[in-house]
């Protein structure tokens, strides 16, 4: 197993981890029922996409 050569400072550790955060996904309201959903996706509740009724079997 590898052994570190030098101790990693708090600053360097923080800089390394600066990109590890989670991002919040955008949500939009459905045009028909108003439920929150991801953009460019059909609504699972009312089966519509851009006010067009989908026939899902």
Swiss-Prot record:
GO BP term, pick one: translation
Entry keyword annotation includes Hydrolase: no
Biased composition (Basic residues): 7-19
SUPFAM superfamilies the record matches: Zn-binding ribosomal proteins
Annotated spans, Disordered: 1-20
Listed GO MF terms: structural constituent of ribosome
A Pfam entry, by short name: Ribosomal_L32p
Cellular component annotations (GO), alphabetically ordered: large ribosomal subunit
Assigned keywords, A-Z: Ribonucleoprotein, Ribosomal protein
Family statement: Belongs to the bacterial ribosomal protein bL32 family.
NCBIfam families named among the record's database cross-references: rpmF_bact
PANTHER family linked to this entry: 50S RIBOSOMAL PROTEIN L32 (PTHR35534), LARGE RIBOSOMAL SUBUNIT PROTEIN BL32 (PTHR35534:SF1)
Listed name of the protein: Large ribosomal subunit protein bL32
Species name: Ureaplasma urealyticum serovar 10 (strain ATCC 33699 / Western)
Species lineage: Bacteria, Bacillati, Mycoplasmatota, Mycoplasmoidales, Mycoplasmoidaceae
